[in-house]
């Protein structure tokens, strides 16, 4: 199960530089707008110290990390919803991702170009955020307006149950968008959420803000005025802010583990910005990790929190879900505490879970099935 997050922002805020650091893909990061036209998609491993510890304990032939995907979507400019810049192509790319990572420039650099009509040295995080959000809102409003009249007609004339339910949802969304607010600010019940999901709206997607600061300021970002502004706005959306230096992260991505540790220590950091971003993205999408562990392989698997054991088994293979019998389960903490599966069992901590078991982050599972 791959997390899919689209990296968005105005031209030259550091999107492609960040993407390069995440994926080590070397995507073009030229200093001019629209250096990225087709989205770059990178699948990256999720760093997890638990996977490393399990490998140390079990000593398998192979270790496999779970993965997630980032898409570097070319810079959006004011008027994108009307086709400005490379407009609707970018919005269509954003529509396909599960979450939005919104990169905001929070550093001064006279050598970095800005979008047309903005001086290179002028930094205004709030204006940048507003520009992006407004384009997404306008794109959603266009989508809603296209559906509104047609669904209303069917709902009123044919009394179709599904159309009536959808029209009710459209009536909730339309005025909110018209007032310049994102659809994610609306509370929907469970049935309404199913309808909203089918609308593929941009402003219902969860958002994570990335404040891209200079290398000199990344170790102590709390006093940066730009970062304070971004955090204040993000709080109004219950969104998280991750502070990174994309340029520093790109340098770090080229180093081996030993040099990486020394580089981070020299900068006054205890972890990379990419690791922080990964954790934040996981939290944003409500994801967790369970493990399968044996002599041949130790592997991490991504799951949506709240799923039951059969659905977790289905992540490995559909046959596991269809023929699910039970899941022999222990927690990561118990395995580390007792040192082996045998010791966990002797301590009475090895469990057999059935079809109603809600999988927990850090579970180590062996699925029993019959097809």
Predicted regions and their residues:
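Conserved G1/Walker A P-loop phosphate-binding module
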Residues: 1-115, 126, 151
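Short, surface-exposed linear patches
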Residues: 64-67, 90-94, 101, 125-136, ...
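Amphipathic alpha-helical transducer elements in NTP-driven molecular machines
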Residues: 34, 48-51, 61-70, 84-98, ...
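C-terminal-of-GTPase-core extension/linker across diverse P-loop GTPases
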Residues: 3-8, 13, 19, 150-358, ...
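Conserved Switch II/interswitch segment of TRAFAC-class P-loop GTPases
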Residues: 42-47, 74-84, 95-163, 176-189, ...
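Generic signal for short, ordered secondary-structure residues
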Residues: 16, 33, 69, 73, ...
């Amino acid at each position: 199960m791959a997390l899919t997050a689209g990296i968005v922002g105005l031209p030259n805020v550091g999107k492609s530089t960040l993407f390069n650091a995440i994926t080590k893909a070397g995507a073009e990061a030229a200093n001019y707008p629209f250096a990225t036209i087709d989205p770059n998609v990178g699948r990256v491993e999720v760093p997890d110290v638990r996977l490393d510890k399990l490998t140390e304990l079990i000593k398998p032939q192979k270790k496999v990390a779970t993965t997630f995907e980032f898409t570097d979507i070319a810079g959006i400019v004011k008027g994108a919803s009307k086709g400005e810049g490379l407009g609707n192509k970018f919005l269509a790319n954003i529509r396909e991702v599960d979450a939005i990572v919104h990169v905001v420039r929070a550093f001064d650099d006279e050598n970095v170009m800005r979008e047309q009509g903005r001086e290179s040295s002028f930094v205004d995080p709030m204006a940048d955020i507003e520009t992006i959000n407004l384009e997404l809102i306008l794109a959603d409003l266009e989508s809603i307006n296209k559906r509104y009249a047609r669904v209303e007609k069917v709902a009123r004339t044919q009394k179709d149950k599904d159309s009536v339910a959808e029209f009710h949802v459209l009536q909730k969304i339309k005025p909110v968008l018209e007032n310049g607010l994102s659809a994610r600010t609306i509370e929907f019940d469970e049935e309404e959420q199913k309808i909203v999901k089918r609308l593929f709206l941009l402003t219902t997607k969860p958002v994570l803000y990335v404040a891209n600061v200079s290398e000199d300021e990344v170790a102590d970002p709390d006093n940066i005025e730009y970062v304070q502004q971004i955090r204040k706005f993000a709080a109004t959306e219950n969104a998280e802010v991750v502070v990174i230096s994309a340029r520093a992260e790109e340098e770090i991505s080229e180093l081996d583990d030993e040099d990486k540790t020394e580089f981070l220590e020299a900068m006054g950091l205890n972890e990379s910005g990419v690791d922080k971003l990964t954790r934040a993205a996981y939290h944003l999408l409500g994801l967790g990790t369970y493990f399968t562990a044996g002599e041949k392989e130790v592997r991490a698997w991504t799951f949506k929190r709240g799923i039951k054991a059969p659905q977790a088994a289905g992540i490995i293979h559909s046959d596991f879900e269809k023929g699910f019998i039970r899941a022999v389960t222990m927690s990561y903490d118990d395995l580390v505490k007792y040192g082996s599966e045998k010791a966990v069992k002797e301590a009475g901590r090895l469990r057999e879970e059935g079809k109603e078991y809600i999988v927990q982050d850090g579970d180590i599972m062996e699925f029993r099935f019959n097809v």
